[in-house]
Amino acid sequence: MNIQINNIHSTNSLSVIKVLSRIKKYDVVVIGSDIYEKGECAGSLLVDKYYRAPPITHESEYINFLNEINEKENIDLLIPASDAEAVLLSKYSTQVKTKFFLADYETVSLFKDKLKATQALMKNNIKVPRICDNLFNEKKVIFRKRNSVNSM
């Protein structure tokens, strides 16, 4: 089974690569890519095959790159490991020839924005932590960037 993981300098990608490398029941070949030269990021040395990718901000070039790797390596599954890639793949899902599993573009875009996602969940009567407008009376607060994958 040929599995492609991109953005392999990231912690998410490294974790997925490590998990895939432990699978012994199937013959898993991990194909990785990133904008860096091989050896400039740890993930490039942990995959079976490595390709240098164009920046994800060059959308059409990046989609073409994915399709070329799919054709060359006969990719069975692409695992998106970053928010940016998830948004891009959902946006161009009909143009990407590789199999991947993601929600539709509207849903991925909504949940990329933590404030909009929280408001949508509240509107549908789903309990979520409250949003604080005034932090002076709060004892403990978790700060979260609106468009990121982590908290402070």
Q: Which role fits each region the language model picked out?
A:
Residues 34, 104-106, 147:
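Short, well-ordered turn and helix-capping elements at secondary-structure junctions
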